[in-house]
């Protein structure tokens, strides 16, 4: 078992002169030996300011070299970084910090007014200057504490869930989960020792994919992590070309934006030999465009903050369904019965993951009730529904919470969304159930379009598909964008609130759509 710090230290031992971190905006580079020196220096500073082993220390920063060094320095000390999404509003951060009894937060001078809120009662704020982050503190009496190997179950990091149904839960990741998470993701990304691996950090490191799969995975294999602080698709395309990026690991939203920017051209991405998407189901039109433009295997990853990547598809353009990951054991179980009882092939149920797997979390921070609800009889309940087909592949059908009950029939929102998204003018689609006196709920589609479209054309797409008649949307709305939470996932709860406010509106007689504007997402 190796800690995150030890993985980086081993890489520094193997190739001290290789470039570990590269800031694409300034061009500043850190070799592995320089990175290791910075980590030790910042760890010394933090220890001198009172940070101790097993202490919860919060950060809320974007993808930067400074943030990376701080997180590794905390891990070096045996402290527990609590990595908060910087997109959360200040009052949400304060609620998390107070609820989870976090007594120390770290900011940098460069953050200015961003990052964790200042002046929280009972919380110590450590502000690190550029000088400290670049030089550390090495004077007599301030030697870096000796490294102490942790126990496998000791907490290593805390990440937060996306919070689609309320305040995010703190997911405690133990030290024994670090290597399995990194190794599975890195091998799927095609990383190999001795290879030339340049990874563009599009995925944020407050997300487990961005941290273990891109950031730490890159460093564990002597690659170069190129952090993207703020996503600009045109600039990202330029960086891919200029910096010879070899792996693009991002969300479907990122890929859609990259393909849509005027800066995009297939030849600008000729250095890319690996593409992975995660975080949400991908629109088939995006997948086809990626395949046509890049002509490299496109890997589909499924996972959760709690279990990392339980399922994957090594070539999403050629194969249907997903396979269990190397460090996971999965099955489908009845929602109302023990998850230890597996359903037979072809029978739909809830996806559950073996909670004893090395990559799995231990518990939710200060939330034993939530832990008990999710880990049952040794299995983690994902809340996702699906089944195993006759070939042994896992077919996911959607979220159990997103199930629509219309006329006593169950409809998976994601299934309908995938059908509607087949129309080339549909940029994004979300399907929800709205209250209806006759049917209980009526299937309702909300779309973002790239060109004029009518509801009749979308209905024809459904009629021409394999979709059952009762699953067809009966109402269509068109909006400027879909509402998203701080994790950039579509917020169906917010969407239902908008739709409720416009439920009495009449469709445009020419298009069949009810149209309204959604305020800018968080």
UniProtKB/Swiss-Prot annotation:
PROSITE patterns: AMP_BINDING. One of its GO terms (molecular function) is ATP binding. Pathway: Xenobiotic degradation; 4-chlorobenzoate degradation; 4-hydroxybenzoate from 4-chlorobenzoate: step 2/3. Optimum temperature is 25 degrees Celsius. Optimum pH is 7.0. ATP binds at residues 161-169, 300-305, 410. Pfam families: AMP-binding, AMP-binding_C. Keywords: ATP-binding, Ligase, Nucleotide-binding. Its cofactor is Mg(2+). GO terms for biological process: fatty acid metabolic process. The keyword ATP-binding applies. Catalyzes the formation of chlorobenzoyl-CoA via a 2 step reaction. First 4-chlorobenzoate is adenylated by ATP, followed by acyl transfer from the 4-chlorobenzoyl-AMP intermediate to CoA. Benzoate, 4-bromobenzoate, 4-iodobenzoate and 4-fluorobenzoate also act as substrates. Inactive towards 4-nitrobenzoate. Belongs to the ATP-dependent AMP-binding enzyme family. Homodimer. This is 4-chlorobenzoate--CoA ligase.
């Amino acid at each position: 078992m190796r800690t995150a710090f030890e993985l980086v230290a081993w890489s520094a031992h193997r190739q001290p002169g290789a470039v570990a971190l590269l800031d694409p905006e300034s061009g500043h580079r850190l070799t592995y030996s320089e990175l290791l020196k910075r980590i030790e220096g910042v760890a010394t500073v933090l220890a001198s300011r009172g940070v101790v082993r097993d202490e919860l220390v919060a950060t809320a920063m974007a993808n930067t070299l400074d943030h990376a060094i701080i997180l590794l320095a905390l891990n070096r000390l045996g402290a527990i970084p609590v990595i908060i999404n910087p997109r959360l509003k200040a009052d949400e951060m304060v609620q998390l910090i107070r609820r989870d009894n976090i007594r120390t937060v770290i900011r940098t001078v460069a953050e200015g007014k961003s990052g964790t809120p200042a002046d929280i009662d009972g919380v110590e704020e450590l502000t690190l200057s550029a000088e400290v982050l670049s030089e550390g503190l090495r004077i007599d009496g301030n030697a870096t504490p000796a490294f102490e190997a942790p126990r496998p179950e000791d907490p290593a990091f805390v990440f937060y869930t996306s919070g689609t149904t309320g305040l995010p839960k703190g997911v405690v990741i133990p030290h024994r989960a670090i290597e399995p998470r990194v190794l599975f993701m890195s091998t799927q990304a095609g990383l190999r020792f001795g290879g030339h691996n340049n990874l563009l950090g599009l995925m944020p490191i407050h997300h487990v994919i961005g941290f273990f799969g891109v950031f730490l995975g890159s460093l564990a294999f002597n690659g170069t992590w190129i952090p993207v602080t703020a996503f600009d698709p045109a600039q990202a395309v330029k960086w891919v070309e200029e910096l010879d990026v070899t792996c693009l690991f991002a969300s479907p939203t990122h890929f859609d934006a990259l393909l849509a920017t005027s800066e995009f051209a297939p030849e600008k991405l000729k250095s890319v030999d690996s593409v992975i998407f995660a975080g949400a189901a991908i629109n088939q039109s995006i997948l086809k465009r990626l395949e046509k433009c890049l002509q490299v295997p496109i890997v589909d990853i499924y996972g959760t903050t709690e279990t990392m990547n339980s399922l994957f598809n090594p070539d999403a353009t050629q194969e249907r369904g997903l396979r269990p990951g190397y460090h996971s054991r999965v099955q489908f179980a009845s929602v109302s019965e023990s998850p230890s009882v597996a359903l037979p092939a072809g029978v739909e149920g809830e996806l559950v993951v073996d909670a004893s797997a090395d990559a799995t979390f231990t518990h939710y921070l200060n939330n034993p009730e939530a832990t008990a609800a999710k880990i049952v009889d040794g299995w983690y309940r994902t809340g996702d529904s699906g089944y195993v087909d006759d070939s042994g592949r896992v077919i996911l059908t959607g979220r159990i919470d997103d199930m629509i009950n219309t006329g006593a029939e169950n409809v998976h929102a994601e299934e309908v969304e995938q059908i509607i998204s087949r129309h080339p003018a549909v940029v994004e689609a979300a399907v929800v159930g709205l209250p209806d006196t006759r049917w209980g709920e009526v299937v309702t589609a909300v779309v973002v379009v790239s060109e004029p479209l009518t509801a009749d054309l979308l209905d024809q797409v459904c009629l021409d598909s394999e979709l059952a008649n009762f699953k067809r949307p009966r109402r269509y709305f068109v909006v400027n964008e879909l509402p998203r939470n701080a994790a950039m996932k579509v917020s169906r709860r917010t969407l239902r609130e908008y739709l409720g406010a416009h439920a009495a509106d009449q469709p445009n007689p020419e298009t069949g759509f009810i149209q309204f504007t959604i305020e800018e997402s968080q």
